[in-house]
Amino acid sequence: MSRKCQLTGKKANNAYAVSHSHRRTKKLQEANLQWKRVWWPEGNRWVRLRLSTKAIKTLETKGLSVMAKEAGINLNKI
């Protein structure tokens, strides 16, 4: 599985690591992803998702069903 948030689609960003002498080397800024078990009331079961920490905070306000619908995810297949 790729390092990508399953609800928001967040993934790594290409950036430069800049030294004191201003030499630049490429680096990846990875998203802060966590495995999270979320209760899905409509399905009456737990769903295990790989989410960014921003998505976890948004999930608490919006709810799982609304966010999954916005992302176009069928929770029955997960």
Curated annotation (Swiss-Prot):
Keywords, ordered alphabetically: Ribonucleoprotein, Ribosomal protein
GO MF, one annotated term: structural constituent of ribosome
Tagged with keyword Ribonucleoprotein: yes
An annotated GO cellular component: ribonucleoprotein complex
Any single biological process term in GO: translation
UniProt keyword Ribosomal protein present: yes
Superkingdom, taxonomy of origin: Bacteria
A Pfam family the protein falls into: Ribosomal_L28
Membership in a protein family: Belongs to the bacterial ribosomal protein bL28 family.
Alphabetized NCBIfam families for the sequence: L28
Protein name: Large ribosomal subunit protein bL28
Native source species: Rippkaea orientalis (strain PCC 8801 / RF-1)
Lineage summary: Bacteria, Bacillati, Cyanobacteriota, Cyanophyceae, Oscillatoriophycideae
Gene expressing this chain: rpmB
